[in-house]
Amino acid sequence: MAAQRATLEVVDELVHEVRPGMTERQLAARAEELAWAHGATGVWTPIAVGAGPGALVCHPAFPPTDRAVNDPDLVWFDVTPEFAGWPGDATRSVVVGDDAGRERLLADARRIQHAIVDACEPGMPGNELFAVARRLFDAYGYELLDLLGNIGHDLGRGGVVTGFIDPRNGTPMWGCWAIEPHIGLDGVAAKFEDLVWLGEDGAVVLA
């Protein structure tokens, strides 16, 4: 809980600091700097930043570049610090400048994220939650951009990932899961991510 709380503080600070002209690489370095200031001991997977066309791909194989934030733009930050073995994982998106289309995508992405999180139930199969997400994407008219075709993964101590939320995974979901649908349309993308604990007492968003 404390690790995720600190992670959310880091990503929220980034959302308020981003400006046109800053590069993905600069923003990733700033994310690490903020994470250390919040007590992080490392990162369990590389921090990712997406700006402009770079926001269409979120994967460790595509690290932050010298691509600069435009005006207008839609930028996301996927922040992944570790605190003495406990991982944090959060993504937030923000519109830079004034653009109604990007603002609409941002609002829809947030609504979709909230709806998927609200649908989480302890022990539900991963592919059932994916089906919920797929219906939302179709209803809102967006594409799923994740390169592996999933909307999230489990997350254990040390950043261990053993399963994904995709059409093929019928394993019951228990423990900590990252819910992170990466969606877009017409060359613009947005992403939100939260950690949800699925236990005997129900589903709890870690914050």
Where do the model's predicted regions map?
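Active-site neighborhoods and metal-handling regions in enzymes and metal-associated proteins
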Residues: 1-207
